[in-house]
Amino acid sequence: MDSLEDFSARLREALEPDVRRHFSPEFVICSEYFDRFTTEVAGRDLERLGLLEEFRSPATVEEALARKGYVPRASIALAWMLEKLTEEGFFASSSEAGGARYVSRVPVPADSGAKEKALAIDPSCAPAFTVVEELSTHIIDYFSGRKTGEEILFSPARLSLWFDYFHNDNLLYAVNNRLGAEAVARALPRTHASTVLELGGGAGSAALALLERLSVDGRLPAIGKYFFTEPVPTFLRRGERALRQKFPDVPLEARKLDMNASLVEQGIEAESVDLVYAVNTIHVANDLEKTLRGIREVVKPGGAVVFSECVRPRPGQPIYVEFIFNFLENFVRVVTDPEIRPTHGFLTPANWRAALARTGFDRFALLPDVETLARDYPSFFVGAITARRPSAG
């Protein structure tokens, strides 16, 4: 048994059965290969950008960008690449008054065939690799200021990449939807049909996974009304079409909705929703505290929120799925807060716990217990957060 198979077996053994079934050996092993692939791409991109030579001696991100004539906005993406390569032992870093200084320790990683190994195990994980490759192809345009991340990754010609990426057939993404569905199934009341509001529903893969999960248990009648919402019309229409086609009997209302604005002012009645659901959405709220307070406003007393998220096990830890998103403005240009959101991107369990407590939620739970798992498996970062609005308040 090779080391990745052994790692997969030990990790899965640490999960309770209803969670374990969402983390197949294929998923765990392909995730590790994708992590290697992302690290290797980051190293190759530094070479292509001519930035590797700038770190033969210690330098800050800003110094290296300025010497090469690259735009300042690339600092976030470059800092992540350097942090990831540092964590993997290829760079070293030191903190100084002028900021972190990085220096190359050993040659950047060579191509290990990680993509090919992952695809040999399960070809359905291809979309994750394709998105990274697409970004890498245009990375010089981004660093030079000729294109934004949105222009590279979200042009109309590339939307199909994202339909494939966020699809439940994508081995490396579907776990977010399946785990979220498990958490919602546990949180939904069993005494009455519920009104569910999904935020940032995208093309519908999270809603489909949830309704499939409820259908298996014979609990589709638990949904009294499902608000499927999404701010981007193209995704909204696609998601609504998929949901109506597969679950025509579910009471569905699809509407454009922006979590960064008042939900009540957009037509969601105060204290009308039993459960607010979102998958990999809330972490990109422009003002996290404001968005959570807006969500609380529409949740019934005693109602729940379930957020299936990438969860950063420890502060500052570079997570490979961030690589592509660090090039997108709505991911990085957010309101920060030292307690609940010290930086852009994914939050730690402690950040989520503090953010939800501050905004009037209690009974915080995390499925699975990422904090405990991270002691032995530091690269485990998928979790479903559940919290409730107190019954009296």
Go through each PLM region and give its residues.
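Class I SAM-dependent methyltransferase SAM/SAH-binding core
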Residues: 195-197, 201-264
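A short SAM/SAH-binding and catalytic strip from SAM-dependent methyltransferases
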Residues: 273-289
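A short glycine-rich, Lys/Arg-flanked "PGG" loop and its adjoining helix->strand segment in the class I
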Residues: 289-304
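Local beta-strand N-terminus motif with an aromatic residue
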Residues: 193, 223, 272-274
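N-terminal accessory segments
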Residues: 1-195, 213, 217, 221, ...
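C-terminal alpha-helical "lid/dimerization" subdomain adjacent to the S-adenosyl-L-methionine
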Residues: 308-359, 363-369
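A short acidic, Gly/Pro-enriched loop at the edge of an enzyme's catalytic core
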Residues: 263-276
